[in-house]
Amino acid sequence: ISRSIKHRNAKLMLPCPIHLDLVVTMRALSSRNTQSNIVLRNEIDKIRLLFRKDRESYLCFYRILGFYPHNIQLYEQALLHKSTSVRSDKGRPLNNERLEFLGDAILDAIVGDIVYKRFEGKREGFLTNTRSKIVQRETLNKLAVEIGLDKLIKYSTRSSSHNSYMYGNAFEAFIGAIYLDQGY
């Protein structure tokens, strides 16, 4: 069985079927645009995934994100509630609070940009109130549940430090992880 592939006005006959991902990768290699680089990066990450011991974690995050994480520890940390007793190599508590701080700032900036462009001519007070309503904890809690973060958060059932905003906080931390992992 042979498969015919057209590439830049040339016709290549291959003696056996090839995996479509290889075709996508080759097209990305031949192009220099940003979208192609993203496709290529994702294809390379898929290949690396085959050799990882923590494949399931990567696949889980891929289902949520639509791309493979480069630094999976960031995403795992984003899902560690402060009630866990996990410690870093240096003995410091390891949780999602710092990533939450970063994610909160990023969400404010992104939503602020969208609101600014969407409501041209509106005054600052209106823009601030609109942004605040969009990034409020109840909304972030719902978003976290919609994408399935609520099932992945690690927390201590013995601690009384749970709050009704745990999911929204994890969502913000997840945004912070994406920002650090994918660049800015």
Which stretches of residues belong to each language-model region?
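Short, low-complexity, intrinsically disordered N-terminal modules
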Residues: 1-6
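Short hydrophobic alpha-helical segments enriched in small aliphatic residues
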Residues: 8-10
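Nucleic-acid processing machinery
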Residues: 13
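RNase III-family endoribonuclease catalytic core
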Residues: 19, 23, 27-184
